[in-house]
From Swiss-Prot:
GO terms for cellular component: periplasmic space. Belongs to the CsgC/AgfC family. Gene3D superfamilies: 2.60.40.2420. The keyword Signal applies. Disruption phenotype: Cells lacking this gene make aberrant thin aggregative fimbriae (Tafi) which are composed solely of CsgA. Normal Tafi are composed of CsgA and CsgB at a 20:1 ration. Keywords: Chaperone, Periplasm, Signal. Its main location: periplasm. It is found in: Periplasm. This is Curli assembly protein CsgC. It comes from Salmonella enteritidis. Induction: Expressed at low levels in agar-grown cells, part of the csgBAC (agfBAC) operon. NCBIfam families: PRK10102.1. Plays a role in the extracellular assembly of CsgA (also known as AgfA, AC P0A1E7) into thin aggregative fimbriae (Tafi) fibers. Assembly may also require CsgE (AgfE). Tafi are thought to be assembled via an extracellular nucleation-precipitation (ENP) pathway, and possibly also via an intracellular non-CsgC-dependent pathway. Residues 1-8 form the signal peptide.
Length: 108
């Protein structure tokens, strides 16, 4: 049983830390890997609002250590009640590791 708990704690995962001040959301995607990795990181931001639609994409290759949360970026987004915003983070080593996570968990 303890081995299963330890494995679960060390699982590869992408998480988001989010703070809000008024309509400004600061979103910080973090990745924790159980093996070190030279990975391709892609962050896609899609926004639909009264003023139109915008897409922003960042791609970079990072050397990520194992077993510690690493901040991948820091995005500040002004989101009004009429806006729909989706941020998708993908981390891949091009072989066996492929993680993808969306913020917010279910699109607004």
């Amino acid at each position: 049983m303890h081995t299963l708990l330890l494995l679960a704690a060390l699982s590869n995962q992408i998480t988001f830390t989010t703070t809000q001040q008024g309509d400004i959301y600061t979103v910080i995607p973090q990745v924790t890997l159980n093996e070190p990795c030279v990975c391709q990181v892609q962050i896609l931001s899609v926004r639909d609002g009264v003023g139109g639609q915008s897409h922003t994409q960042q791609k970079q290759t990072l050397s990520l250590p194992a077993n510690q949360p690493i901040e991948l970026s820091r995005l500040s987004v002004n989101i009004s009640s009429e806006d729909s915003v989706k941020i998708i983070v993908t981390v891949s080593d091009g072989q066996s590791l492929h993680l993808s996570q969306q913020w917010p968990p279910s699109a607004q």
